Amino acid sequence: MTYIEILGQNAKKASQSVARLSTASKNEILRDLARNIVADTETILTENARDVVKAKDNGISEIMVDRLRLNKDRIQAIANGIYQVADLADPIGQVVSGYTNLDGLKILKKRVPLGVIAMIFESRPNVSVDAFSLAFKTGNAIILRGGKDAIFSNTALVNCMRQTLQDTGHNPDIVQLVEDTSHVVAEELMQATDYVDVLIPRGGAKLIQTVKEKSKIPVIETGVGNVHIYIDEFADLDMAAKIVINAKTQRPSVCNAAEGLVVHQAIAKGFLSQLEKMLKESNQSVEFRADEEALQLLENAVAASESDYATEFLDYIMSVKVVDSFEQAISWINKYSSHHSEAIITNNISRAEIFQDMVDAAAVYVNASTRFTDGFVFGLGAEIGISTQKLHARGPMGLEALTSTKYYINGTGQVRE
């Protein structure tokens, strides 16, 4: 058997046991894990430091290194996230609908686990813990394949998960880490249809596209955030500038950070001037990659290429497009959007409603930063990712997104005539 076949077989077996765990047992184990992760802080930080040194040696940008880096506060935040998942209502066994049909059959539609989840993700090591917590709470086994940049951190965290399961008398193979980070093994995981029920990629555009093209397992597409903010001619310009600065600069390396700015021509001069003024006042610097009209109005700008409009920069860089009309803004955003999060800043209620209806994205904002697209903020607890597709799940994926449904039919001897 191949390495992936062994992992898959182990996961399939473990999925049978975790599916039967009571809510109380799952919550107790999750709380044990949270305590154990905090207790293992020094070990985890030591391993994380190895990843950080390696990343710097490989010339990875400081913004991307920040995604990788852990500290005591971030480890405590990881533990707090586990506690929050433990406190959430368990969807497994929840009755979605129930009725008695004309034949006297009692039909219940219940939430059940998906089975075995595989996740391929990039640098952030906290993803491994979030993914396990949600998968475990919903009675699923999970196979984690993180990026090579975080292999030491992920190994330390998964070892803690497996030890917690073993110490509580449960199968540690409920969670497994693919320790071989080669592309060959990743592609083998994408073909493991006999063992894996769903594959969730979380990372950049290249990773997502590779998984979509090569996976034979059903895929839930997540992550890529080519996010836009449209400044309408009826916008409060001061509020608009504050929102853009927050959405771009608070944490530019995350998928809900704004990447594209679309501005109505009627207020472009005043707004862009206000934006640059407020950036200077807040000691922030953003490189604007602008179209011809915006280029004449901005101080810190270079001419945009066509590819810039479709790029998730994950940096202090932002594309700028000036449009002649509200309708052109919607058309532009729908052309370049990755269907993650989009926003309009306007005091025109009719335009706000039309924008929310017509823009094709999982989350559409009016007069607010796109940085709020997050499982915790939406009240879902931790998230396994933000789905940018329409089938099965869309937007931040919490517990319910990791379940399926099953019909339970009870009769008293009925046969079909």
From Swiss-Prot:
Which GO biological-process labels does this protein carry?
A: L-proline biosynthetic process
Q: What is its EC number?
A: 1.2.1.41
Involved pathway(s)? Amino-acid biosynthesis; L-proline biosynthesis; L-glutamate 5-semialdehyde from L-glutamate: step 2/2
Q: Where is this protein found?
A: Cytoplasm
Catalytic reaction annotation: L-glutamate 5-semialdehyde + phosphate + NADP(+) = L-glutamyl 5-phosphate + NADPH + H(+)
Main subcellular localization, coarse class? Answer: cytoplasm
> Which keywords appear in this protein's UniProt record, sorted alphabetically?
Amino-acid biosynthesis, Cytoplasm, NADP, Oxidoreductase, Proline biosynthesis
Q: In terms of domain of life, where is this protein from?
A: Bacteria
Record's Pfam families?
Aldedh
What's in the GO CC field?
cytoplasm
Q: What class of enzyme is it?
A: oxidoreductase
**One Gene Ontology molecular-function label:** NADP binding
Q: Which InterPro entries match?
A: Ald_DH/histidinol_DH (IPR016161), Ald_DH_C (IPR016163), Ald_DH_N (IPR016162), Aldehyde_DH_dom (IPR015590), G-glutamylP_reductase_CS (IPR020593), Glu-5-SA_DH (IPR012134), GPR_dom (IPR000965)
Q: Which family does it belong to?
A: Belongs to the gamma-glutamyl phosphate reductase family.
What this chain does, per the entry, is described as: Catalyzes the NADPH-dependent reduction of L-glutamate 5-phosphate into L-glutamate 5-semialdehyde and phosphate. The product spontaneously undergoes cyclization to form 1-pyrroline-5-carboxylate.
Spell out the protein name for this chain. Answer: Gamma-glutamyl phosphate reductase
Organism expressing this protein natively? Streptococcus agalactiae serotype V (strain ATCC BAA-611 / 2603 V/R)
Organism classification:
Bacteria, Bacillati, Bacillota, Bacilli, Lactobacillales
Gene encoding the protein: proA
